[in-house]
Swiss-Prot record:
Converts 2C-methyl-D-erythritol 2,4-cyclodiphosphate (ME-2,4cPP) into 1-hydroxy-2-methyl-2-(E)-butenyl 4-diphosphate. This is 4-hydroxy-3-methylbut-2-en-1-yl diphosphate synthase (flavodoxin). The gene is ispG. The keyword 4Fe-4S applies. Pathway: Isoprenoid biosynthesis; isopentenyl diphosphate biosynthesis via DXP pathway; isopentenyl diphosphate from 1-deoxy-D-xylulose 5-phosphate: step 5/6. Its EC number is 1.17.7.3. It catalyses: (2E)-4-hydroxy-3-methylbut-2-enyl diphosphate + oxidized [flavodoxin] + H2O + 2 H(+) = 2-C-methyl-D-erythritol 2,4-cyclic diphosphate + reduced [flavodoxin]. One of its GO terms (molecular function) is 4-hydroxy-3-methylbut-2-en-1-yl diphosphate synthase activity (ferredoxin). [4Fe-4S] cluster binds at residues 272, 275, 307, 314. The keyword 4Fe-4S applies. It comes from the Bacteria. Keywords: 4Fe-4S, Iron, Iron-sulfur, Isoprene biosynthesis, Metal-binding, Oxidoreductase. It comes from Zymomonas mobilis subsp. mobilis (strain ATCC 31821 / ZM4 / CP4). NCBIfam families: ispG_gcpE, PRK00366.1.
Length: 377
């Protein structure tokens, strides 16, 4: 038993599918997605944006395919990307057929506008022929007309019924490489819909609060909605939808997972809001560190506390810690133990060098363990 059972999250049991070379569901890590917002026909701009997202750790990227020109550009985009590409399809089912042929790893279809069961069957045939997965993307803003008439408004029962109807369409075609989302911009509606769907099916679930808003408001809304579900063990992949750069969606997605100890990437900073007791400018220091340590992918914890009230206690729980002291000298903790002091003028560069050295040490140890495992085989 864990020594901290109150921190344990038991994930919902789900089937594992493959989206390109990324496993989704089962015991696979919860993957982080985003979506490009460049014109897809501008392949170079789209590829450049994908590269920026890859640099911050994105696992899967969705690309909108509204017309033939976009699916024509998709082939070059898929070839240039290092992560699997998901084609976002609405209204025109033939775009899904073209995207599958262009190398998309997954086809996102919307039950509210993809069309008849015959069209869905054609999409399934294309997916099978090209080794694509499918995401059934139900959205409260584009529910089928008959479901709106039946229920009077978007509600959990309506979203779940839409999802179940389209799951059956895929299963009737003997297709099982699919994941499902039941998104809404209303957190209550989205959470209730996902919880109901999670009880009804065993397929992987793609989490998201759609049209969440700008960077701050959308982050809060997504953290509440997605975080609530993850805390309940629900969710196999996620996308934080923000009116912001896609790279920010990836960062927020990882921060939600980090907060719940479900997946860690990069430096997790514990810092105080600062007050008159601070021995150095905490806000300025943390901002600078977040920028200078953004390239670190290795999971490391770092505490930056302005004074000795909580500083030593937080430092005991992190890999590296700094606590503000008097006369411009600050305590540095390594692995929870007081190690040395550092002066104001040298502190920022010193912390960066400590984190980089710790990351290199961890990666070297990982490589050593991997080599030993390979040798043993």
């Amino acid at each position: 038993m864990s020594i901290r059972p109150w921190r344990h999250i038991e994930r919902r049991k789900s089937r594992k599918i493959m989206v390109g070379n990324v496993a989704v569901g089962g015991d696979a890590p919860i993957s982080v997605q985003t979506m490009t917002n460049t014109p897809t026909v501008d392949a170079q701009a789209t590829i450049a944006q994908i590269k920026r997202c890859e640099a911050v750790g994105v696992d899967l990227i969705r690309v909108s395919c509204p017309d033939k020109e976009s699916t024509a550009a998709l082939k070059d985009i898929v070839r240039a990307a290092e992560v699997p590409i998901i084609a976002d399809i609405h209204f025109h089912y033939k775009r899904a057929l073209e995207a599958a042929d262009a190398g998309a790893a997954c086809l996102r279809i919307n039950p509210g506008n993809i069309g008849s069961s015959e069209r869905v069957a054609e999409v399934v045939r294309a997916a099978k022929a090209n080794g694509c997965a499918i995401r059934i993307g139900v959205n409260a803003g584009s529910l089928e007309k008959e479901l709106l008439e039946k229920y009077g408004e978007p509600c959990p029962d309506a979203l779940v019924e839409s999802a179940l109807n389209h799951i059956k369409l895929l299963q009737d075609q003997d297709f099982h490489e699919f994941k499902v989302a039941v998104k809404a911009s209303d957190v209550f509606l989205a959470v209730a819909s996902y919880k109901a769907l999670a009880k009804a099916v065993d397929c992987p679930l793609h989490l998201g609060i759609t049209e969440a808003g700008g960077l701050i408001g959308g982050t809060v809304k997504s953290a509440l909605g997605i975080g609530n579900l993850l805390w309940d063990g629900i969710g196999d992949t996620l996308r934080v939808s923000l009116s912001a750069d896609p790279e920010q969606e990836v960062r927020v997605g990882y921060d939600i997972l980090k907060t719940l100890d479900l997946r860690t990437r990069g430096v997790r900073v514990v810092s105080c809001p600062s007050c008159a007791r601070q021995g150095f400018d905490v806000v300025k220091t943390v901002k600078a560190l977040e920028e200078r340590l953004a390239h670190i992918a290795t999971p490391i914890s770092l505490s930056i506390l302005g004074c000795v009230v909580n500083g030593p206690g937080e430092a005991r729980e992190t890999d590296i810690g700094v606590t503000g002291g008097g006369q411009g000298k600050h305590m540095v903790f390594l692995s929870g133990v007081t190690d040395h002091t550092v002066e104001d003028a040298k502190m920022l560069d010193h912390i960066v060098s400590l984190v980089e050295a710790k990351a290199a040490e961890i990666e070297a140890e990982k490589a050593k363990e991997k080599a030993a495992t390979v040798a043993a085989e």
